[in-house]
Amino acid sequence: MSQTVSQLTRQPELEILEIKNDSIIFILSNTDISVANALRRVMIAEVPTMCIDLVEFESNNSVLCDEFIAHRLGLIPLVSDNIDKFCYTRDCSCSDRCDQCSVELRLNVKCTENRPRDVTSSDLLSQNSAVIPVSSQVTSSNSEQEIPIVKLRRGQEIKLRAIAKKGVGKEHAKWSPSCVATYQFQPIIVLNQNRIDELTDQQKEEWVGSCPTKVYSYSPHQSTQQVTIEDPLRCVYCLECKKKAESFGKPDLVHLEQKQDKFIFTVESSGALKPEDIVLYAIQIIKRKLTDIQGQMAEGML
């Protein structure tokens, strides 16, 4: 029997497990691997941010040549919370650049002391208070948050103008807002309690300890003395528990399976965007792409 479009249509769901300042973990369910992979790729390569793309040097007598410093400046993540307010340079009506498509940053540092002077991302001064180096918005005085650019000795100086533009990761990796964007299938773990009961206390402890991510738990001092699944989401499919069970002559002690329509995503942000915003932008981009395809199909172009 043929299936209708409504029967084939899925309604993907997203469940957030954890949100931090620089990362998010969520479950994408009721969909297939093609959608999961599309979401991952868009988060890496098609969510726009602001990054330094042009550097004009006025003075530089440091140990690093202009190209080295320009490359380092381009890799400094800039806060891009207002990215929607900027347009791409190629789409802007200006002849060269303007406030609608770019942001100017200045770096002017001279070492006047006998000890070396560290030039860092905190020395970059932006003409737009909303587009600044990510390290500059850290309120603590911890210098480890600052990104080093170059060291100057007495008498050396560096003076330049940098232009930040809007772009995406598929043009250059510096525009990617994601440090990490990975997913794995949600595991299905089933324990054979009859087989587990045949193990000695020592064997139970050895079997539970064979899992490097501590999926299982067992305490011989508890009244039940049962092996339990503590957190199935920790499973990385290393199969160490299967190997240990086989060494005990009980290969059917545990059953592992991947749930094909449920994916656990881990996304870490460079700081340019909040991790939850990366996910939302990616979903919007995918929806826009699908809408464009629908429009072209309706016009008979596909």
From Swiss-Prot:
Q: Per UniProt, which keywords does this protein have?
A: DNA-directed RNA polymerase, Nucleus, Transcription
Question: Per its UniProt record, what Pfam families does this chain match?
Answer: RNA_pol_A_bac (PF01000), RNA_pol_L (PF01193)
**Mostly located where?**
nucleus
InterPro entries, per the entry = DNA-dir_RNA_pol_insert, DNA-dir_RNA_pol_RpoA/D/Rpb3, RBP11-like, RNAP_Rpo3/Rpb3/RPAC1, RNApol_insert_sf, Rpo3/RPB3_RNA_Pol_subunit
GO CC terms of this entry? RNA polymerase II, core complex
Q: What does this protein do?
A: DNA-dependent RNA polymerase catalyzes the transcription of DNA into RNA using the four ribonucleoside triphosphates as substrates. Component of RNA polymerase II which synthesizes mRNA precursors and many functional non-coding RNAs. Pol II is the central component of the basal RNA polymerase II transcription machinery. It is composed of mobile elements that move relative to each other. Rpb3 is part of the core element with the central large cleft and the clamp element that moves to open and close the cleft.
Q: What name appears for this protein in its UniProt entry?
A: DNA-directed RNA polymerase II subunit rpb3
The scientific name of the source species is: Dictyostelium discoideum
